[in-house]
């Protein structure tokens, strides 16, 4: 490698162009071998740098997302989940609802794929360089309560609640909220109203949600009013995936009497 090569790579590093620094000579040789133009060479190295930056951005977004694992729409079995509205679900994956700050609510019994679809939407958003946050309702309440007790609620709200363009809250209704927790959750929905998209999953119909919000019917109604104003409600029916797997290996669920 000659001194000119060294100078080019040093300049690339100073300009924060690491991908070009490592690959420019390869693209130069490739362009020469294909009788390409200077413009072809410039386009090739800029395309390479852009792709590398996109990949680094996606890796950071994935690390910060809270997604426990990668799920995709392609992994979702519509042949088994016959109660899932396929056309409605597929349309959500164009992610236009995020650009419009609209919400999505997945309703259905345990095991029908609500969390799978919400995680898949989150992953698709990350692949489009959209900042997301996935969290269970229980963990969200724990973090909100801790921030409130420490006098850091405003900071937490700004960073964790308003920061993500898409906030995914899983398992609403599995554990009931106390009065203070219900108020904190209402503030989450109220602050994100028409500012960012929120995805909720719940095993409870809307008519029973107040049971999870300290039986506060008024607060629940106000929360739903904001949540559902610009919202795609996806009702999924069917048998639990997990129950299906147990049956396949010969484990029968116990029936309470």
What are the language-model segments listed below?
Residues 1, 5, 14, 28-39, ...:
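Conserved phosphate/pyrophosphate-binding and hydrolysis machinery centered on Walker-type P-loop NTPases
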Residues 1-10, 36, 152, 163, ...:
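Intrinsically disordered, low-complexity and often Lys/Arg-enriched segments
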Residues 11, 17-19, 63-85:
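Dynamic helix-loop-helix/coil hinge segments at AAA+ ATPase domain boundaries and subdomain interfaces
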Residues 17-69:
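Interdomain "pre-motor" coupling segment immediately N-terminal to P-loop NTPase/helicase cores
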Residues 84-162, 212:
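Conserved P-loop
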Residues 103-105, 166, 199:
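Residue-level preference for the first positions of well-ordered beta-strands
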């Amino acid at each position: 490698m000659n001194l000119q090569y060294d100078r080019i790579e040093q300049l690339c590093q100073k300009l924060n162009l690491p991908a070009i620094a490592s690959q420019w000579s390869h693209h130069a040789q490739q362009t020469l071998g294909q009788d390409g133009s200077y413009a072809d060479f410039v386009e090739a190295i800029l395309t390479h740098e852009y792709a590398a930056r996109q990949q680094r951005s996606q890796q950071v977004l994935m690390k910060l997302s809270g997604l426990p694992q990668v799920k995709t729409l392609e992994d979702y079995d519509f042949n088994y989940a016959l109660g899932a509205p396929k056309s409605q679900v597929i349309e959500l994956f164009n992610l236009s609802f995020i650009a419009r700050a609209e919400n999505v609510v997945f309703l259905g019994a345990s095991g029908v794929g609500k969390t799978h679809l919400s995680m898949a939407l989150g992953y698709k958003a990350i692949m489009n360089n959209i900042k997301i946050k996935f969290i269970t309702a229980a963990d969200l309440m724990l973090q909100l309560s801790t921030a409130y007790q420490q006098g850091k609620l405003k900071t937490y709200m700004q960073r964790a609640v308003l920061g993500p363009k898409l906030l995914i809250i899983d398992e609403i209704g599995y554990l009931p909220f106390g009065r203070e927790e219900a108020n904190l959750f209402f503030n989450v929905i109220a602050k994100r109203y028409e500012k960012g998209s929120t995805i909720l999953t719940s095993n409870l119909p809307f008519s029973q949600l107040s049971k999870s919000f300290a039986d506060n019917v008024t607060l629940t109604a106000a929360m739903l009013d904001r949540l559902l104003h610009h919202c795609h409600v996806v009702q999924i029916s069917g048998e639990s995936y997990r129950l299906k797997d147990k049956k396949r290996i010969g484990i029968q669920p116990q029936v309470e009497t």
